[in-house]
Regions:
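Cytosolic juxtamembrane amphipathic/interface segments immediately preceding
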Residues: 9-22
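Hydrophobic cores of alpha-helical transmembrane segments in multi-pass inner/ER membrane proteins
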Residues: 33, 91-98, 155-162
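Extracytosolic (periplasmic/ER-lumenal) interhelical loops and adjacent juxtamembrane/interface segments
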Residues: 45-83, 139-147
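Membrane-interfacial loop-to-helix junctions in multi-pass inner-membrane proteins
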Residues: 20-27, 106-116
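Small-polar-interrupted transmembrane alpha-helices in polytopic inner-membrane proteins
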Residues: 32-40, 96, 109-134
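N-terminal signal-anchor transmembrane alpha helix
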Residues: 23-53
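Alpha-helical transmembrane segments of multi-pass integral membrane proteins
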Residues: 124-162
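Hydrophobic alpha-helical transmembrane segments
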Residues: 82-102
Length: 162
């Protein structure tokens, strides 16, 4: 008899948790996106504030997720952000789009899969040309990687479109 009571209590709590998640799905996704997009920026700030271990842990957390090439990354107070330009633009845009969607979701229609696919074309072209240039040294992307160059703006714009 005690097992049935515990089981039904667990089931009731599980149901309540699922219901809460279904009601607040956008809050959950936006919170995750903001945390994911924000932590890489805290890495150089922690290092600059005298907490090198925390900064390095945050940096290494994102190592498997981004190439982190210094010439393609932002720096704050002389320390590298844990994302490259493209990833920074992409994940910041996702977080901002989620917040804007939360404000305007009653007034906008969902995008079609075709539109989503079209928005991926620029980043696929940009990323594949970078890959080909890096692997084969073709030189057609040799304009440099500094902020303000064509390569920088292509990475930022295509990252934000995703």
């Amino acid at each position: 008899m005690a097992d049935a009571t515990i089981s039904s209590d667990i089931q009731r709590r599980l149901d309540a948790g699922v219901q809460w998640g279904l009601r607040h799905w956008l809050l959950i996704i936006n919170t995750g996106a903001i945390v994911y997009a924000g932590l890489p920026w805290l890495s150089p700030m922690a290092k600059a504030a005298g907490h090198p271990l925390i900064g390095e842990l945050l940096f290494r957390l994102y190592t498997p997720l981004c190439h982190q090439l210094p010439e393609r990354s932002f720096f704050i107070c002389g320390h590298q952000v844990a994302f490259c330009h493209r990833c920074a633009a992409m994940y910041t845009a996702i977080a901002l789009a989620g917040l804007l969607f939360a404000l305007a979701r009653q007034r906008i229609r969902p995008a079609t899969l075709k539109m989503g696919g079209l928005l991926l074309v620029p980043i696929l072209l940009d990323g594949s040309t970078h890959l080909l240039d890096d692997v084969f040294g073709l030189g057609f992307r040799g304009g440099g990687d500094a902020i303000g160059t064509v390569n920088f703006w292509l990475r930022m714009i295509t990252g934000a479109l995703v």
